[in-house]
Amino acid sequence: MSNEIELLQKQVSELQDLVKKQSLIISKTGERVLELQLDKQKHDVTDFDSKFSKSISKKSGSATQFDATDFATNEDLVELVKELQGELNFIEERSIRRLVNSLKKDDDDVIAPLPNADGDIPAISDGVFPKSLKEFKDIPDLKLVRLAKFYERLPPTLKEQEDFENFLEGKVEAFHINETTDEEISKELEKFSKDELDDAFNDVARYLGLSLRRGTEIW
């Protein structure tokens, strides 16, 4: 028992170190993006000063026309920082929850739901996200596909692509992949082989940080 506890403590320590390294890399990436944005801002200002000086030296009586929208405003930079911070928060939240899920071993252990790419967290109350390790292990195919779609572990169908394009073109006000009906998923399930469903199960398990796998010799 003591050896198992020591092993778990070692795994927790290694995972914590990994999360710290990932957070540092993400933070450095965000700083670099801001540096590039500021460098561009400085370059644009210098370029404008040069054009303005040439215009004055020619004594043309009017300054060269320029488009003020080419320059990033303080509001743009603030918004960029907010977006980057939001992404960092989601990534950190996913890392923490994956760390928690990686330690789940017993059937009754509760699974922590992770945010998807849009930052949405599935509600356990709606019955789609499994409450425990056993529920995930025995998840029905329909719920598995719905969960895989939520986490973008499956490619979109033609209809989903069309719906998303309509959303981008402003033809519909909102687009949510989880609005696919059970009937639509049931029809889609007919095209899946057992191996494809096993792959979907394993992909979702990896995303959630769970050690469960279907099949043999699967990492």
From Swiss-Prot:
Cellular component GO terms held in the UniProt record: cytoplasm
Domain of life: Eukaryota
Cross-link (Glycyl lysine isopeptide (Lys-Gly) (interchain with G-Cter in SUMO)): K137
UniProt keyword terms in alphabetical order: Cytoplasm, Isopeptide bond, Phosphoprotein, Ubl conjugation
Disulfide bonds: none
A Pfam family annotated for this UniProt entry: DUF3294
Cross-referenced InterPro entries: DUF3294
Chief location bin: cytoplasm
Localization: Cytoplasm
Residues recorded as bearing Phosphoserine in the entry: S23
Miscellaneous remark of the record: Present with 1550 molecules/cell in log phase SD medium.
Protein name (database record): Uncharacterized protein MRP8
Organism taxonomic ancestry: Eukaryota, Fungi, Dikarya, Ascomycota, Saccharomycotina
